[in-house]
């Protein structure tokens, strides 16, 4: 049975609805990125789904379509701020900033996961990136944005293979940390090795 990815957007059909998702909560290095997207229900882009279920090539293609056709915004919280305030608070801050950066103010904000926000517009949906088109679109924008940032950082620190692992704790990444130590972009609050 196919899921209606517009179910939640239809539920709030009289409201401006944004979806929000993040990329980079679990990596050992780099920022956390949150993106907010307001889908135009009159212009549905086909193929949008959770970024983790798409090839890199398909994500890149959809990123270009989403950012060309929908209202969107992104926020980036650095690895140092993650260390200062913790990953959960950094993620929530990125989500709030991304919504504030939208050129159109949403009345409802659909959030992937179970994070709770003081802002009453925020509605948490567990597994939201599989249940909401807006959240799925945001997951693509966040993932592509973060992957591009990590690719840029990989040029400066190629030994950590961030161009392949995006800062996640792969075997090769942990081996590189054991050999070279932590880079300036590693999260000090994350214990890995």
Swiss-Prot record:
Cofactor note, please? Manganese or magnesium. Binds 1 divalent metal ion per monomer in the absence of substrate. May bind a second metal ion after substrate binding.
One biological process term in Gene Ontology: mismatch repair
Q: What is its main location?
A: cytoplasm
Q: Enzyme group, top EC level?
A: hydrolase
User: Which residues does the UniProt record annotate as the domain RNase H type-2?
Assistant: 15-193
Q: Which InterPro entries match?
A: RNase_HII (IPR022898), RNase_HII/HIII (IPR001352), RNase_HII/HIII_dom (IPR024567), RNaseH-like_sf (IPR012337), RNaseH_sf (IPR036397)
Q: Which Gene3D superfamilies match?
A: Ribonuclease H-like superfamily/Ribonuclease H
Against PROSITE patterns, the record matches this protein to: RNASE_H_2 (PS51975)
Annotated catalysed reactions: Endonucleolytic cleavage to 5'-phosphomonoester
The record's function comment reads:
Endonuclease that specifically degrades the RNA of RNA-DNA hybrids.
This chain belongs to which protein, by name? Ribonuclease HII
């Amino acid at each position: 049975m196919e899921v209606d990815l517009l179910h939640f957007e239809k539920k709030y059909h009289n409201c401006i609805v944004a979806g929000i998702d993040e990329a980079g909560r679990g990596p050992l290095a780099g920022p956390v990125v949150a993106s907010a997207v307001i889908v135009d229900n009159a212009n549905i882009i086909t193929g949008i789904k959770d970024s983790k279920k798409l090839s890199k090539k398909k994500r890149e293609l959809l990123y270009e379509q989403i950012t060309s056709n929908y209202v969107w915004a992104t926020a980036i919280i650095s690895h140092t701020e993650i260390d200062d305030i913790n990953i959960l608070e950094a993620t929530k801050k990125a989500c709030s900033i991304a919504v504030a950066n939208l050129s159109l103010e949403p009345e409802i904000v659909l959030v992937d996961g179970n994070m709770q926000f003081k802002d009453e517009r925020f509605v948490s949906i567990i597994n939201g990136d599989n249940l909401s088109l807006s959240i799925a679109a945001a997951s693509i924008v966040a993932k592509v944005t973060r992957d591009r940032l990590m690719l840029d950082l990989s040029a400066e620190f190629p030994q950590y293979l961030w161009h392949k692992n995006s800062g996640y704790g792969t075997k090769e990444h942990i081996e590189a940390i054991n050999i070279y130590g932590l880079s300036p972009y590693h999260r000090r609050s994350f214990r890995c090795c």
